[in-house]
Amino acid sequence: MIYISGPISKDPNYRLKFRAAAEQLKLRGYNVINPAELADVLPAEHLSHEEILFTCKHLILQCDALVTLPGWEQSLGCQREVGFAEGADLIVLPIEELLQN
């Protein structure tokens, strides 16, 4: 299972980017957790950033790897997801690197 980490808060097109990444991974046979879909089931306007990150950490723990989307370095949330995944000994790599193989 692969978790997708990428900028959300400051990117109005984040849903399209996450969806495209998820589709590419699924076409290669991977099971994917797309956190951009959480907005469909979690009332984000009623949750703090910390509460959302708490949920994402639990989802990350269900995965074997985390892939990053371009621009993740500028997102504090992504930085925290990557650090958490590395601390949990998950494979962490840019999506481009995974898709090259």
Give the ranges of each region predicted by the language model.
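Conserved catalytic or regulatory cores that recognize and/or transform ribose-phosphate-containing ligands
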Residues: 1-101
